[in-house]
A protein has these predicted regions:
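Alpha-helical transmembrane segments of multi-pass membrane proteins
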Residues: 1, 172-181, 222-229
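Internal alpha-helical transmembrane segments
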Residues: 1-14, 224
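Alpha-helical transmembrane signal-anchor/signal-peptide segments
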Residues: 8-26, 30
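Juxtamembrane transmembrane-helix termini
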Residues: 8-11, 184, 232-239
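Conserved PDZ fold ligand-binding element
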Residues: 25-46, 113
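PDZ-domain C-terminal substructure recognizer with occasional recognition of PDZ-binding tails
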Residues: 26, 30, 36-37, 51-93
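Functional transmembrane alpha-helices
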Residues: 78-177, 194-217, 232-239
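Transmembrane helix boundary and interhelical junction motifs in multipass membrane proteins
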Residues: 183-193
């Protein structure tokens, strides 16, 4: 992530303009204001503003922003845009990326990882709550296809953009794998941690055959899910 930030830079959550007739204008936000927090989520990139609104579609939000060194809080209720087909709080941001020194690279590299983990966790929430279907999941086949598409689009602008975009994909995949591996499912590290917790609560170890059976069933379920996801990927490609 630090290499990505060093090469691509980072954008800042500074408002470039306020849309007429939306909540941000009514709350008094202005161009030049820097968004610091949305509800309890700290904002470091402008793209986090967009992603937060996506995962909290239509929900009112308390926005903490900075103007001339002073912090202010605005309560904003999103308004539905028929033209765009989604709820908007009514702000625009400048997505131009800036380069930082070594300390900023380390700092924003950590923020980038946090951002990708946030996306992964909230995507899983949408999956488990039914906002996304199992068919929306993507596996190795879809990932390879995406990488191929990104490469073909990036190489037009040069090798530098290929490297930057591949690094971005690598960060996203790493965050996904890290979060998935910590899920409390048998055959994953999260499942092992869960079993250890059960043993601590019970005050004694599980029998080896019981633990082995649990892991075997969990592994079989994971393999079945992988086959389904790969089938889903191939079906999408054929269509």
């Amino acid at each position: 992530s630090c290499l990505f930030i060093a090469m691509a830079g980072f954008d800042t959550p500074v408002i470039s303009g306020v849309m007429e007739g939306y909540g941000a204008e009514a709350a008094g936000l202005q161009a030049g204001d820097r968004i610091i927090k949305m509800n309890n989520y700290n904002i470091h990139f402008y793209q986090e503003v967009t992603v937060y609104n996506y995962f909290h579609n239509g929900e009112a939000v308390d926005v903490v922003y900075e103007r001339d060194g002073d912090k202010h809080t605005a309560h904003i209720t999103p308004i539905y845009s028929d033209e765009l087909g989604k709820y908007l709080i009514g702000i625009n941001g400048n997505l131009d990326r800036q380069k930082g020194n070594i300390f900023e690279v380390l700092e924003y590299g950590a923020y980038e990882v946090k951002y990708q983990i946030y996306i992964t966790i909230n995507s899983l929430k949408m999956l488990f709550t039914g906002q996304l279907g199992v068919k929306d999941m993507s596996g190795p086949v879809a990932i390879v296809d995406t990488i191929s598409d990104v490469y073909e689009q990036s190489i037009i602008d040069g090798v530098f953009y290929v490297i930057v975009n591949m690094l971005s994909i690598a960060i996203l995949l790493s965050a996904n794998l890290g979060v998935m591996n910590l899920l409390p499912l048998p055959a994953l590290d999260g499942g092992r941690i869960f079993l250890i917790f059960i043993e601590l609560v019970r005050g004694k170890k599980l029998k080896a055959e019981v633990e082995g059976f649990i892991n075997m069933v969990g592994f079989a379920m994971l393999m079945a899910l992988m086959v389904f996801v790969m089938y889903n990927d191939i079906t999408k490609l054929i269509k």
